[in-house]
């Protein structure tokens, strides 16, 4: 396993993912359903079917690009074996997850551009406050669900693809 390569590839897919999500969230925050449920329910207008479809397409597109990049990079590492591919993928996607937490949840959603990514009609909702945001969304998402469920699943799929 090439740990340095895994770290660099993780930074690259993190930049792709977080850059795309940040730009799209700033364009229209309603395109993403990654807000705490209380904020989503407080919105005067719920996500329309069109917005849900856009969310699904963007999610598949952005994650697909990251998966293709990551798998292609693994093919060119010169390593072999399912477990080597799995752990390289796990490290890559873990770095993306940490980038998502620090860049999107901490800096974008809680930082300088906080007012630009508010769903219209939910201004001043208490779940936009840092502590509530972390408690109701970010901690569970980034330190429980993603590292123990989503990343292992994606790393297995990626390792199987690369092994073929």
Predicted regions and their residues:
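Core segments of transmembrane alpha-helices
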Residues: 55-74, 139-152
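Juxtamembrane boundary at the C-terminal end of a transmembrane helix
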Residues: 153-164
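Cytoplasmic juxtamembrane interface segments
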Residues: 69-91
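Membrane-interface helix-loop junction between the first two transmembrane segments
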Residues: 23-44
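Membrane-water interface at loop-to-transmembrane-helix junctions
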Residues: 4-5, 46-58
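Short membrane-interface loop/juxtamembrane segments of multi-pass integral membrane proteins
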Residues: 39-51, 118-138
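Alpha-helical transmembrane segments
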Residues: 2-20, 83-102
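Juxtamembrane non-transmembrane "cap" segments at the membrane-aqueous interface
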Residues: 103-124
